[in-house]
Amino acid sequence: MASAFVAQAVPPEQIVYEDRFQSLENWVAEMEQPGTASVRAGVLTIDVPAGCTLWFKPELSSPVRIEYEATMIAAGGPNDRVSDLNCFWMATDARAPGDFFAARRSGKFGDYNQLRAYYVGQGGNSNTTTRFRRYIGDPVLRPLLPEHDLKDPTVLLTPNVPQRIRLLAQGSTIRYSNNGRLIFDFYDSRPYTRGRFGFRTTRSHVELRNFRVYRPRTR
C-alpha cells in the first residue's frame, strides 16, 4: 500500500507590533538640538540639525524581525544632507539595566557608548561609510571589525529613494538588509536577546513609513 504524504501547513508569521504613524505615542525622542519629529498621513518625518534617536517604547525579545521604509530627503532644506540612516536594535543601557528610559541621553552620539546593542550606520560620515557594530556597554570602546567597515558606493544612500530596511535578531543570527540586499550577516556567540529598537540619524531629513515588528518562524 502506498503511503500518503500529508503536507504540513506553515503558520504565518506573527506581526507583534505595527505603527501606521498616526501619532508619536509609541516613541521617545532624544535630540541633541531642537528639531522636528512629526507624523502626518502615515509618515513619520524627522528633520534635525544634529543628533537624534527615536526609541520605540516596547521592549523586544528574540527572535524578532524589524522592518520599515526610510527615505532620505534631498529637496534643498537646511538639513537635507543625505547621511546617517542609522539604527540600534536589541539595545539595553548598562547605566539603567532595570529601566531603559531612566538613563539620561541627550541625543549626542557619545551618550550611547554604554549601550549593549547592535548598530548599523548606513551612509555615515556624510554618506561615505556603512558600518556595523556590536556595542558592549563600554563608555569608550565601540569595536569595529574590518569586514564591517564598508565604503563601496553600492551600500551607501541614494537621495529620495525608499530604502526598505530589515533587521533580524534570531538566536546567534544578526542581520541587516536594505531593499532585499543582505549587507551584514553576523554570528554572535553571546547574542543580545532583548532590548529596544531606536532609529538614529544626525543632521538630516528622513521620512519613515510602514513600521512592523514580526516574530519570525523558527524551524
Protein language model features and the residues they cover:
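Extracellular glycan-recognition regions
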Residues: 5-219
